[in-house]
Amino acid sequence: MGALTSRQHAGVEEVDIPSNSVYRYPPKSGSYFASHFIMGGEKFDSTHPEGYLFGENSDLNFLGNRPVAFPYAAPPPQEPVKTLRSLINIRKDTLRLVKCAEEVKSHGEEAGKAKVHYNVEFTFDTDARVAITIYYQATEEFQNGIASYIPKDNSLQSETVHYKRGVFQQFCLPSHTVDPSEWAEEELGFDLDREVYPLVVHAVVDEGDEYFGHCHVLLGTFEKHPDGTFCVKPLKQKQVVDGVSYLLQEIYGIENKYNTQDSKVAEDDVSDNSAECVVCLSDVRDTLILPCRHLCLCNTCADTLRYQANNCPICRLPFRALLQIRAMRKKLGPLSPSSFNPIISSQTSDSEEHSSSENIPPGYEVVSLLEALNGPLTSSPAVPPLHVLGDGHLSGMLPSYGSDGYLPPVRTLSPLDRLSDCNNQGLKLKKSLSKSISQNSSVLHEEEDERSCSESDTQLSQRLSVQHPEEGPDVTPESENLTLSSSGAVDQSSCTGTPLSSTISSPEDPASSSLAQSVMSMASSQISTDTVSSMSGSYIAPGTEEEGEALPSPRAASRAPSEGEETPAESPDSNFAGLPAGEQDAEGNDIIEEEDRSPVREDGQRTCAFLGMECDNNNDFDVASVKALDNKLCSEVCLPGEWQCAEHELGGRRPSARPRSPRGGLGKEASAFRIETVALPGTYV
C-alpha cells in the first residue's frame, strides 16, 4: 500500500481493470495486504500479513469490488489523524418488518389466501437534512466516489422521503409495502457471487455541495419463519465520506442496557453495564482490543497486558493491536448541577495533569466513551432513603443520593433521643427481618399470642432494674459527627458494578473512589429474602441484653409492672422479645415476633453497629486485631464503615482502597495506538 508521504504528491493512477477482475477475498493470486500499515500517523509492520485488523477477512468483500481513487486527502501535518464526521446513523437493531393493518387481496384470488404485506421501519439519527430511499434486490455501483444502488426492477424501490436534522427519528412509510413471498428463496439472502443485496436502506445527506456524496448505507436480508411470516436481519453498515467507502464494525461493550425496553433486567446484567475496566475495576475503559473489538480495558491495564499476555480477557482470543478511543467535551462550570460526574471524576483529574502530553485542548476534558455515546449513565430507579415506612417496617436498603454530589443533612441526636430512637428502630428492624428469616419456619399459634405478650412484659420489667453503668448518656462530640463510608463487611472487589449517579468519598481518603462505589453499589441493591436468610443471627436493638443486662426503651418503661399488670411465671423456653405499645396489625392484635433460632454458637456471636442497631450476623471482618467475636454494646449512632475503637473490642482499622496499578510504558512487544476517533455533535475531537 505504500507510505503516506509517497502518495501526497503522486497523481491518480489510471488503472484499466476489466469487469471480470475484481477485488475479492481470498484473492485468486497474490496478497491482499501489504507488509505494513499506517495508523495514527505512524508506520507499523504487519505481524500477520493476511489478517484483517478490524474483523473477519470475509468482511472485506463488503467494501466494493473496485479500488478507489488515490491519493487520499492527507491530514494537516500537525494533526496526524483526520477525524471523519458521521452525519447519519441508522440504528440497525431497530430495523423491523411490520404487518400492514389490512391484508391486500389481488383480483381473482381466493379469500382464504390473502397475501401479507409489510412496512419497513427503523430509527435513525442525523445532524443534517437527509433523503432516505429503500431498494430491494439491488446491486451497488461506485461512480466518482458516489455510491448508487440499482434494483433489478424499478418497482422494487420506495419513494424518497426527506427528513430534517434530529435524533431518534422514526422512518415509517405506510404507502410503501413489500411482500417477500413473491421472491425466490435464494433471493431472500445475500450471495457473494450474485452481488445482489435483498434490502438496501440508502440515506444521503441533502445539504449542498459541502457534503456531496456523504451517505449511510444499511444492508439487510430476509428470513422466513416456519409459520410463513418474514423478518428482516441487518447485514452490514457502510459510510461513504469524501468518496471513500468505510465499513462500520460493531464495538462490543459500549451499548447502554438501561435504555432497553425490558425494564426487568437481572442484577447480573445490570452489573455488566459498568464503565470500569474489567481488570482493575477502577479506571474508565477506553482501549479497544483488535481484531475482536472488545472495549474492556483502560489505558494503564492495556499497557500492562501487552507485556504479560496476548489474549483478550473477554474472549481469550489473541489480539494484534490495542486502540485507545477518547471522547472530549467542554468543561462544565462550577455552578453547573452536573459538573460533578461520578464515573469520570478521577479520570478528569488525571487528564488535567497530563493535558499537555496527551494533546487535550484547554477547556476540554476526557469523558467516558459510554457516556459520550449513550448520554449520562443512570443507575436503577431511585432507591428510597433509609426510613421507617408507614406500616412500621424498616426499609432494608441504603439511601440513594442525587447527582448533585453532596450528602443529605444529618440530624444530630441528643443522647436520650438517640437511645430511644435506636431502641424503637431496632425493634422494628428485627420484626421485619425476622419475618423474612423465618418464612420457612413454624408460625406461632394463635393461642400462644396472649401468653407470649405477658411473658415479654415480664422480661422487660425485670430488665428495667438492671442497667450497665458504662452505657450512660455521655457522648463525645466526635461521636456525633456521622460519616458515610464503605462498610467493612462488604467485599470491595465485588462492589464495582453499576454505573452510579454520584459518588461520595470518605473525608479521610478523598481519592478512594472504590470505597465510594462500594457504598453506592450497596445503595442500589435491596436486601432480598435469600440475603437475609443467610444471616445466622437477627437484628436486635442496642438496648437489648448483654450478659443478662439491658437498656430498656422509654416506651417499654411505661409498661412496668407498677401499672397493675399481672406478672406470670416465666417459662424456661420463652424466647420472645417485647414490642413497644402501638405495634399492632390491621386487626388491632399485638404482633409478637419470634427470635431466630438458627444453630449458632453462643460464644461465637458478635454485634456490629449498623445505624444504631446491633447485628448478630457473624460476618468476618477484615480486622487484624480480632481476638474474639464478642464486643460490647455501643450506644453511638454509627453508619457502615465507622467503628468507635474506644467502645469496641475490635481493632479499628479502616479498609483502604486498593492501589492502582502502575502505569506501564510503551514497548515494542505489541503495537499500541492512541487515536481520537469519536466525533459527536457539539463535541471536540
Swiss-Prot record:
<dbReference type="Pfam" id="PF13920">
    <property type="entry name" value="zf-C3HC4_3"/>
</dbReference>
<keyword id="KW-0519">Myristate</keyword>
<dbReference type="InterPro" id="IPR013083">
    <property type="entry name" value="Znf_RING/FYVE/PHD"/>
</dbReference>
<dbReference type="GO" id="GO:0005737">
    <property type="term" value="C:cytoplasm"/>
</dbReference>
<feature type="compositionally biased region" description="Low complexity">
    <location>
        <begin position="434"/>
        <end position="443"/>
    </location>
</feature>
<comment type="function">
    <text>E3 ubiquitin ligase that ubiquitinates APBB1 for its degradation by the proteasome and thus prevents apoptosis and promotes survival of neurons. Has a dual role in neurons as it is also required for dendrite growth and maintenance for which its ligase activity is not critical. May act as a scaffold molecule to regulate this process. Acts as a downstream effector of the interconnected PI3K and MAPK signaling pathways and thus participates in the regulation of the cell cycle.</text>
</comment>
<dbReference type="GO" id="GO:0061630">
    <property type="term" value="F:ubiquitin protein ligase activity"/>
</dbReference>
<feature type="lipid moiety-binding region" description="N-myristoyl glycine">
    <location>
        <position position="2"/>
    </location>
</feature>
<dbReference type="GO" id="GO:1903861">
    <property type="term" value="P:positive regulation of dendrite extension"/>
</dbReference>
<keyword id="KW-0862">Zinc</keyword>
<keyword id="KW-0808">Transferase</keyword>
<dbReference type="InterPro" id="IPR045194">
    <property type="entry name" value="MGRN1/RNF157-like"/>
</dbReference>
<dbReference type="InterPro" id="IPR001841">
    <property type="entry name" value="Znf_RING"/>
</dbReference>
<comment type="subunit">
    <text>Interacts with APBB1. Interacts with CHD1; CHD1-binding controls RNF157 stability. Also interacts with ATRN, MEGF8, TECR, MSI2, PLRG1, BYSL, MTERF3, PSMA1, MRPS18B, PRPF4, FASTKD2, SLC25A1, SMU1, CNOT9, MRPS2, MAGT1, FXR2, EMD, PSMD8, HDAC1, RAN, HSD17B12, TXNDC5 and MRPL19.</text>
</comment>
<feature type="zinc finger region" description="RING-type">
    <location>
        <begin position="276"/>
        <end position="315"/>
    </location>
</feature>
<dbReference type="GO" id="GO:0044297">
    <property type="term" value="C:cell body"/>
</dbReference>
<keyword id="KW-0863">Zinc-finger</keyword>
<keyword id="KW-0449">Lipoprotein</keyword>
<feature type="region of interest" description="Disordered">
    <location>
        <begin position="433"/>
        <end position="584"/>
    </location>
</feature>
<protein>
    <recommendedName>
        <fullName>E3 ubiquitin ligase Rnf157</fullName>
        <ecNumber>2.3.2.27</ecNumber>
    </recommendedName>
</protein>
<dbReference type="GO" id="GO:0008270">
    <property type="term" value="F:zinc ion binding"/>
</dbReference>
<feature type="short sequence motif" description="D-box 2">
    <location>
        <begin position="657"/>
        <end position="660"/>
    </location>
</feature>
<feature type="compositionally biased region" description="Low complexity">
    <location>
        <begin position="552"/>
        <end position="561"/>
    </location>
</feature>
<feature type="region of interest" description="Disordered">
    <location>
        <begin position="650"/>
        <end position="672"/>
    </location>
</feature>
<feature type="region of interest" description="Disordered">
    <location>
        <begin position="339"/>
        <end position="361"/>
    </location>
</feature>
<dbReference type="GO" id="GO:0016567">
    <property type="term" value="P:protein ubiquitination"/>
</dbReference>
<keyword id="KW-0479">Metal-binding</keyword>
<keyword id="KW-0963">Cytoplasm</keyword>
<keyword id="KW-0833">Ubl conjugation pathway</keyword>
<dbReference type="GO" id="GO:0043066">
    <property type="term" value="P:negative regulation of apoptotic process"/>
</dbReference>
<feature type="compositionally biased region" description="Polar residues">
    <location>
        <begin position="478"/>
        <end position="537"/>
    </location>
</feature>
<feature type="short sequence motif" description="D-box 1">
    <location>
        <begin position="329"/>
        <end position="332"/>
    </location>
</feature>
